[in-house]
Amino acid sequence: MISKTTPPVIESGRLRLRSLTVADLPMTLAWRNQDAIRKWFFHSEIISPEQHRAWFESYQEKDNDFVFVIEEKRVLQRAVGQVSLYNIDWEKKRAEFGRLMIGDSEARGLGLAQEATRILIEFAERELGLREIYLEVYADNLPAIAVYRACDFSIAKTQGGVLYMVCGSDALGASGEFE
């Protein structure tokens, strides 16, 4: 099992995913509050530094919520975004994927969101033994949907302008329905 006291570092050819730290909060808050990014979050209001810090303190206490900072290692050589696995149900071996954003404007359009998604899903399946990863995305967020489809997510259902997508060996569970 993964823990915040011994967080993993996940690497691919050009990316490193490392755990979010308190030092990252100003950067991630600035990314999250960009109009072009926050419009895709279900809670799309501007977040204050105090709200972000309070969220982080609560996050630190959870053993089923892991935020990773995406670092590009070759060209930009800096943090460029974030991605998360959360609502992890260790018993059912499933988790929610999300909070994906490429906040650094120079890093957009380079395929980093797709690569980060792919390596985090592979880590979740291989190292954590998760059999199902699911997410929710606005049906009109076509760039995100393209990333998710390229990483083997499929649409389980659509409701109220939101797609529910799943991937993994137990993607639709025994009942064949999205929970």
Task: Show where each model-derived region lies.
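A short, well-structured alpha-helix characteristic of acyl/acetyltransferase catalytic modules
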Residues: 1-53, 171-179
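Short, low-complexity Ser/Thr-rich regulatory SLiMs
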Residues: 19, 87-89, 157
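Acetyl-CoA-dependent GNAT
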Residues: 44-105
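Conserved G/P- and acidic residue-centered "switch" motifs that form tight phosphate/ATP-binding loops
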Residues: 77, 111, 141
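Conserved acetyl-CoA-binding loop-helix of GNAT-fold acetyltransferases
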Residues: 109-123, 146-150
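C-terminal "cap" of GNAT-fold acetyltransferases
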Residues: 131-134, 138-140, 150-179
